[in-house]
């Protein structure tokens, strides 16, 4: 199948980054014998804009996507996280290529209002929506036109290459990495845990409580030293929702602790998550 994948590829970023959700999706498509072309909406907008001011290139990016669809004739278009590609553009694609399937894949939480609005807008025009939240909480989008599916955060074997479950010499007993503070009070829980364990274990909280965040290879090096980690979302309670922290930890054999309200005990093996 010929796939056109619309997402942000960070073509203008040259510093320490790690594999993205979108990149893992693309690797998976290729591994399953599909041909994939990428359209990095934010980069195209910046390339097309006067003086490289991305916001001035939004209309041009939509035109370029239409041009790419016409030039490549994809069987499937996967729309990832985008605030640039419009519903009107997707409707034009529908008119011009009625046999092409459109799906939206979304890995962001529903408690962020702009993301919920984005899902609803795309659900009105695409064939299916895949979200890293369970169907129980996706019912709010029922009746908008698209079929709704849960999709777990992907683990990529060329990225998650460790198996810490087989190691006994790891210096970091417990880990929590995050510098996000919007829509959350989770640092209160992290502080309580940090105070409770005291000097009994080596608990690293990169990005919080004065410890600098780690990115790219530095983050990978931290994971390579870690026994256990906290998988805490900015808000808890959405069915089966988690950030891609779950795949980064589980894929590398790190035992993780998650909030019970997410319901992961319904399908995640007990030996991988508490």
How should each PLM-predicted stretch be described?
Residues 54-68:
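A short, well-structured beta->alpha microelement
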Residues 57-58, 97, 251:
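Short alpha-helix boundary/capping motifs
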Residues 80-81, 94-102:
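Short, conserved structural micro-motifs that define repeat-unit consensus positions
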Residues 90-97, 194:
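Surface-exposed amphipathic alpha-helices with a cationic face
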